[in-house]
């Protein structure tokens, strides 16, 4: 008989943890005592319409501040500023960068993200068909092309935490295949986390799933 106790499966180490988070927007309570662990690799946040998927991404990005609760990065308490510094997130509805070109937008991110990968960006520009749009002001781009600009920035950023809302929306087939490939790479990372919000899991990707329901997060 072995002297060693039977091995037990251990949960992945959390890169980011949310504890007892309460978020209210106006008269609407979005989350009540929400607890969540985000491990390195790929995580899907899913749920019904208006369940809080986008709001959760904004919380994790430090773009929203909850009424109560706490966040921890690598086990260390993290305020909104720390979350912003660790993450890449862009609100796809924002017009804040509409007057500059995609190329200028990407160039401005290189100083913010020390692990910015210029070669990855070059590959993404080709894979997403952005070469002909790179020097146009963003307001001239279609919704799908603007989304590609954000996606290229996300995957090239080298951020510890990448947050993407509906990564396949408004994409052509070739671009969707490119995004799927990059998400597949993100799923294998042992040091970075990619969190996507969508209505269902993309086929063929190894990921963890978190269901949002009635203000709570449930591991699926």
Residue ranges, per PLM feature:
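Hydrophobic anchor residue at the start of the ABC signature
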Residues: 151
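Conserved ABC ATPase "signature" region
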Residues: 118-133
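ABC ATPase nucleotide-binding domain signature region
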Residues: 61-111, 201-202
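The short alpha-helix immediately C-terminal to the Walker A/P-loop
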Residues: 47, 55-59, 208
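ABC-family nucleotide-binding domains
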Residues: 165, 171-172, 176
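Conserved ABC ATPase signature
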Residues: 137-144
